Curated annotation (Swiss-Prot):
GO terms for cellular component: NADH dehydrogenase complex; plasma membrane. The FPO complex is composed of at least 13 different subunits. FpoA, FpoH, FpoJ, FpoK, FpoL, FpoM and FpoN proteins constitute the membrane sector of the complex. GO terms for biological process: ATP synthesis coupled electron transport; methanogenesis; methanol metabolic process. InterPro entries: F420H2_dehydrogenase_subunit, NADH_UbQ_OxRdtase_chain4L/K, NUOK/Mnh_C1-like. Optimum pH is 8.5. It is an enzyme of class 1 (oxidoreductase). Optimum temperature is 39 degrees Celsius. It comes from the Archaea. The gene is fpoK. This is F(420)H(2) dehydrogenase subunit K. Keywords: Cell membrane, Electron transport, Membrane, Methanogenesis, Methanol utilization, Oxidoreductase, Transmembrane, Transmembrane helix, Transport.
């Protein structure tokens, strides 16, 4: 069985990060924005796991697990905020909302 080269993982992670960055810059919906940020975080996790598997250490995989847990908590808080905003204003368009400004 042949191993997949590291450049394939790095290229895939760069592609996923680019798609997520494009989504962050173009989407106005809050839920789509969180999904694109999660895609960018997952591409960083893919890099961590790929480098970890090629150096035969578990440091990158452990850090990726903590990053996944942190991303899940961030998504839960973000979705809760967006649900509260939706209940108050019946929309989640980020350009029109300025609730969190001082």
């Amino acid at each position: 069985m042949t191993a997949i080269p590291l450049t394939f993982y790095l290229g895939l992670a760069a592609l996923l990060f680019s798609i997520g960055l494009y989504g962050v810059m173009t989407h106005k919906s809050g839920i789509r924005l969180i999904m694109c940020i999660e895609l960018m975080l997952n591409s960083a996790n893919l890099n961590l796991v790929a480098f970890s598997s090629y150096t035969d250490t578990l440091h990158g995989q452990v850090f990726a697990m903590f990053s996944i847990a942190l991303a899940a908590a961030e998504a839960a808080v973000g979705f809760a905020i967006f649900m509260a905003i939706y209940r108050m204003h019946d929309k989640i368009n980020l350009d029109e909302l300025n609730i969190l400004r001082w």
